[in-house]
Structure formats: C-alpha cells, structure tokens
C-alpha cells in the first residue's frame, strides 16, 4: 500500500510537470486564436496580476474594466464587461495554483526584480504613464454578454437561451394534471450535469401518489443545460443563488419546498436553506463535498488539494486534477468534447445500437468552459470555509429533516464527507449505499431512490421527528 502510494505520487510529479508545460504553451496558443477569431486578447488566470493594465470602464457602452484587490501575497485582477461582481466571492484558487513550472519561473523573476522595480519607479514619476485603477469590493451583475465564444458550442440546444428575452434559468416542471400540487420539490444537479440527471431517472419512477401530490422542479444551473451561459460571468455563489431564487422560488411562488441536491448542488442547497430557513421542509444531500478545514489552513486551497490531489490514480482523481489545475488544458477538452457533443451522442447510439440512453452525455457536455471553470473554483473550492458555517446554521436554525446519501465506492468525494455532515448536524440520517459511486448513487437505482425520497417527504410532515437540537 505504501509502495503503490509512493509510486502514484512519483509518477504524478512527472506527469503533472509535463502538463504544466503543455498548459503554458496552450496559453499562448489560445491568446493567438482568441485574437484571430474575436479580434481581442482574452485574459486568463495564469497571467501574473502585476502585469495587468487596469483601465476605467468609464461611461462607454460595452467598455471593459479591470478590477483589482489585494489579498495576502497576490492581487486579484479580473478583466470583465459585467456591471456587477463580487470580489469576496472569487476564489483565490483561480490565481494561485502553484506548479513546478511557476516555481522555476519565480527564480527568474527574483533575478530581474531589482531592474523591474527601478523601471516601475521611473514610470510612476511620469504623469503620462499614470494608471487608472478601479477597485471594487462589492457590486451587482446587471447584464449578460450574449455572444458565445468561438470555442463554445453554437448548436441550437446550447444557444437556445439567446433567443429569449427572459434571462431565467431553465426549469423542467412536472406537476399534477389538475395543477393542484400540495407540496413542491426542487432538484439541484451537480457539477458537469443538468436537470436531466433527475428528469430521466427519478421523475418517471415516482409513484402515482407522489405525482398527484408534489410539483417537481428540476433546474439547469447557470451555465449548464438550457440555461443562460454568459461568457462574462464569474459564476459566483451569489450569482447562482440569485438566479435560482428568481427563476424557481419567485417565478413559481414557492412558500415552502423540499430540496434534493447532488454534489455541487449540495453547497447551493445549504446556502438556500440558510437564506430561507422557514421554507425548507426537508433537505436531501447526495455526496456533499464537505471537508472540515483545519484551523490555520486556507479553506480554498485545502479543498482543492483534497478534491484534486494531483495524482494519476484513480482515474477520477486524475480527471479532477486536470480539470482543476489547468485552465487551458481543460478548455481544450471542452473544445474537443463539448463543442462536438452531438457527434459523440450519435457515435454512442451507433456503437450501442441505441441500447444506451445519452442523457448523461447531454448533462456532462452541454456547458461552456467558462461556466465549468469558474463554478468549480468559485463554488466548490471557494466555499471551503463556508460550508461548515452553513451546516451550523442548518443545525441550529432550520427545522427540517436532513438526509444524506453517499456511494460506498465514490472515488471523487469520499464517504467521510457525509460522516462530517453527521458530526455537524447530529440529526442528519446517513445512508451509505454499498458498491455505488458518485453517479450510480442515483443512476441504476432510481426506483429504489425514488421510494426513499417519498418516505423522507412523508416523514417531514411530522415535525417532532426532526426538531432542532
């Protein structure tokens, strides 16, 4: 066991050093391609913040601005066209992802430091080179950039939101034929997924009694499925929550509702429970990514290293590491797979002779790289120090049943995360399903899971069973 782990780490050092170089080269490749297709150099997060050139957005329509904020030993610098952002919602993992290559380049930078410093001081004395810096701590998003990037999919499915003036999330609704549902259930999918994760598995398998009493609402998160995919969005927690509140809670006038969430969706579900404590009737979490952050450790970096440990085995950990650490390699994967998802669906049907349903491919590939990259860092990693506070609030202030399901063979999010939820919320019921992983916790056992959900919803009508400790 010790030898295999050492071998895994040793091979990982070599493999990820090669990937560091590849990502570095792809950075220049995409800058060139972006300029060729869009007549503009697009900024990326591997660019050193001190070299950014901030300008004022001014009053020009569509003008760009650079937002800068000092945080510790580095600056957060964001180039955007949005009129509304939240710097406190931006994860430092976007800017600080140290690699062997960056450590080597720091040696060169240290050598040039004195020369550069002298040049900078001389420039500061010259009025003509004075920079206008716009520092923003908290603002709000008001417009969506509606033009998809050249590297994103332009098919009718992925761009259907562009033809609508209503910039709301897509919500798949199933309700009783008489439109007289007694209760509401909101489903929130996970990372690289969509509402089809629920509609193709659970919705057809609910009992007739449940279908006649509950209104089911499965939402496509911002940047996924049929929902808007603004390429200038930073996909922060506040943006996601505001869109869910506007598109689901306000749109359907939900006063009370049950919440069912998977993986990434668990973070959003907990945040919703904190904002609407009196509206939650039950809270069901599947594979919640909760990591208890040790004291004195930066939460964002800790969660990133737990989820993406830079190891080549198992394959799930390797894939998560590549997606998390390499902005340009992950964009290449998106360019090859997401932009050609219709071809992949066709080939899958052809090779399996239509014996395999392709809804998982739709959920996995119908997003933009900008959406997946920012959601991963700003929600999953950026919430490292927030989930614990959310759980404390749910324990003390949200009077509802809490149920947690986890696959015993989940290689992406370990089952220890669910036990951590139990320690924070003692009344939570933990269900570890043997021989199931991150996806098969639902897919393949949808009938059984549908019955389990119905039992939770029925039980939630008895308050004394889940009174707050």
Swiss-Prot record:
Entry keywords, A to Z: Abscisic acid biosynthesis, Cell membrane, Cell wall, Cell wall biogenesis/degradation, Hydrolase, Lipoprotein, Membrane, Palmitate, Plant defense, Secreted, Signal
Description of the deletion phenotype: Defects characteristic of the loss of cuticle structure associated with an enhanced accumulation of cell wall-bound lipids and epicuticular waxes. Reduced expression of abscissic acid (ABA) biosynthesis genes (e.g. NCED3) in response to osmotic stress (e.g. polyethylene glycol) leading to reduced levels of ABA and high sensitivity to osmotic stress and drought, especially during seed germination and early seedling development. Increased aerial tissue permeability to the toluidine blue (TB) dye. Enhanced transpiration. Strong decrease in total cutin monomer load in young leaves and flowers.
Inducing factors: Induced by osmotic stress and abscissic acid (ABA).
Example of a GO biological process term: defense response to fungus
Compartments, as annotated in UniProt: Cell membrane; Secreted, Cell wall
Enzyme class: hydrolase
Name of the featured protein: Probable lysophospholipase BODYGUARD 1
Organism of derivation: Arabidopsis thaliana (Mouse-ear cress)
Gene name as annotated: BDG1
């Amino acid at each position: 066991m010790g030898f295999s782990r050492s071998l895994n780490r040793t091979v990982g050092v070599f493999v990820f050093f090669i990937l560091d170089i590849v990502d570095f080269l792809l950075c220049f490749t995409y800058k060139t391609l972006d300029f060729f297709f869009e007549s503009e150099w697009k900024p990326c997060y591997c660019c050193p913040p001190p070299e950014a050139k901030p300008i004022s957005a001014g009053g020009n329509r569509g003008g760009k601005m650079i937002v800068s904020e000092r945080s510790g030993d580095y600056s957060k610098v964001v180039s955007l066209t949005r009129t509304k952002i939240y710097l406190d919602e931006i994860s430092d993992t976007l800017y600080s992802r140290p690699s062997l290559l960056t450590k080597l380049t720091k040696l060169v930078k240290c050598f040039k430091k004195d020369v550069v410093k002298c040049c900078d001081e001389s420039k500061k004395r010259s009025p003509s080179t004075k920079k206008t810096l716009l520092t923003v701590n908290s603002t709000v998003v008001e417009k969506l950039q509606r033009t998809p990037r050249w590297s994103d999919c332009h098919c009718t499915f992925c761009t259907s939101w562009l033809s609508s003036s209503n910039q709301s999330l897509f919500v798949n609704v199933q309700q009783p034929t008489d439109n007289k549902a007694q209760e509401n259930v909101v489903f929130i999918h996970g990372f690289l997924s969509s509402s089809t994760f629920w509609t193709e598995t659970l919705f057809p398998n609910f009992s007739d009694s449940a279908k006649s009493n509950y209104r089911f609402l499965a939402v496509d998160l911002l940047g996924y499925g049929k929902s808007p995919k603004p390429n200038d969005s930073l996909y922060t927690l506040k943006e996601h929550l505001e869109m869910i509140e506007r598109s689901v809670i306000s749109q359907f006038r939900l006063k009370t509702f049950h919440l069912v969430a998977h993986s990434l969706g668990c973070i959003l579900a907990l945040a919703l429970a904190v904002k609407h404590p009196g509206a939650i009737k039950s809270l069901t979490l599947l594979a919640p990514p909760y990591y208890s952050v040790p004291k004195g450790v930066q939460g964002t970096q800790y969660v990133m290293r737990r989820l993406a440990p830079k190891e080549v085995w198992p394959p799930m950990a390797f894939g998560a590491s590549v997606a998390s650490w390499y902005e340009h390699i992950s964009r290449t994967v998106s360019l090859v797979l997401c932009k050609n998802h219709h071809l992949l669906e066709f080939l899958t049907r052809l090779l399996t002779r239509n014996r395999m349903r392709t809804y998982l491919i739709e959920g996995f590939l119908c997003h933009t790289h900008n959406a997946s990259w920012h959601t991963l860092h700003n929600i999953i990693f950026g919430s490292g120090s927030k989930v614990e506070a959310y759980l404390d609030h749910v324990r003390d202030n949200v009077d509802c049943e809490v149920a947690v399901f986890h696959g015993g063979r989940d290689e992406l999010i370990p089952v220890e995360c669910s036990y951590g939820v139990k320690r924070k919320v003692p009344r939570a019921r933990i269900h570890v399903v043997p021989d199931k992983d991150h996806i098969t916790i639902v897919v393949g056992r949808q009938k059984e899971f549908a019955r389990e959900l119905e039992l939770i919803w029925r039980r939630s009508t008895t308050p004394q069973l889940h009174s707050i400790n």
